[in-house]
Amino acid sequence: METKTYKRKSRKQLQRKRRRRKLIRLFLIFILAFLILISLFLGFLAVRQIYQTFFNNADIVLDAGHGGKDPGANIDDAIEKDITLEIALMTQEILEDAGYKVAMTRTDDTFVELTERPVFANKKKSQVFVSIHCNSSEDGSGKGIETYYTEQKGISSENLAKEIQNAVIEHTNADNREIKTANYTVLVRSNMPTALVEVGFLTNSSERELLQTEEYQKNLAEGIAEGILNYIHQ
């Protein structure tokens, strides 16, 4: 009898030990799974931070003037918002082919508030910010290309404007109206070197015709891109 009783007790003890080991094993699996989830979550946060820091920023921000309900200068069938967008998109492609990350204030016919454009550039922490526009004059006599900067930014924006102006004139052979100072919103509210290039007068019939051709738009884009790269490589 004692032997049978001892065997029953041994079996019960063995079963309890097995249950205990099973519970311990399940607990350890739970802890391990929890730690893995925590690691994945922290890894996700780290990846998101890296993305925001390195990938969501941009080297260069391009601003195609006007857009949406704001057409800009509108002479006959030449609309400023359409021309500036085409030039900006071509410039973006050239700069990206050169290995730079480019952000655009707009990539289609969208209205963007003027004050939001420099805010966008500031969020991107870009090295430079370039706004592209077409010019106009009341009597139609205006002709040529000019680039603006603000003296509030010091020599950096002036140098950027010079490089863009020189390169665009070289690529287009347009009349050189030189660089000029102004306190436009996009110039003064951005935190980085900024320039605004007026690529020609829509009120001038010969320039208006040129500005609507793909070849001339490409020449302008090549000049703008070259000027930006020349400034960055200084």
Model-derived segments and spans:
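N-terminal Lys/Arg-rich, disordered targeting/topogenic segments
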Residues: 1-26
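Contiguous, function-dense segments enriched for cysteine-driven chemistry
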Residues: 3-9, 39, 47, 122
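Membrane-entry signal-anchor segments at the cytosolic-membrane interface
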Residues: 20-29, 46-50
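Hydrophobic membrane-insertion alpha-helices, especially the h-region
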Residues: 26-43
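Catalytic-core regions of hydrolytic enzymes
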Residues: 46-163, 170
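Short amphipathic alpha-helical signal-transduction/dimerization elements
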Residues: 92, 96, 165-172, 221, ...
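Active-site-adjacent mobile loop/cap segments within catalytic or ligand-binding domains
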Residues: 131, 138-139, 180-234
